[in-house]
Amino acid sequence: MTNLAEIILKRMKKISILLCALALVACGGHQATSPTLDEVFASRRSIRAYEAGKTISEAEVRELLTATQNAPSWANMQPSKYYVAIGEEKREAVLELIGGNKDRVINAPVFLVSTFETGKSGFFRGNPVDATGDLWGAYDNGLSNAYLILKARAMGFDTLIMGMRNADELRKLFEIPDNETILAVIALGYRAQDPNTPVHRPLDEIAKFY
């Protein structure tokens, strides 16, 4: 009985090892673990060349945008809005409206037009609370965009925030109301290659301790 138990135990171990190996292969040779926040920070880059032929689903974009709803905003005004070009017709139309970035993002499967509602963040009863005015809305939109690009990287996607765009034509294309300011178009896709790591300014140049 003892010998039989030992044989069964050895076979079970072999099966367990085999199953683990198969799971590792199924994950592309990597463990299926979520990246840490520091890993997301370190790997996120502004990507200017995207892999052709790869798609991103609407469900994935919805998950991505849900993360932006956790971004802080002035008095929880949540002024940020997104217009998603995921269908080929709209995607092609956006490509024609982003100036010199077209060739860089031509293979990105999704574009998100980022706007914010004016007269909300930084305002109280219709009046600006200080000289900053609607810049608070732009600030909040930047925070929302930051959540978006970091969540995108955590999901294995890459992004490029583009300020170069034809705002008037984008407004017509997506029927964006006049009370929204268009700040950027964000390309979403998969990097074609790993970019070089940029040189960052020394910490003591950007922070002062007292």
Each language-model region and where it sits:
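N-terminal regions encompassing targeting/leader/pre-sequences
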Residues: 1, 24-27
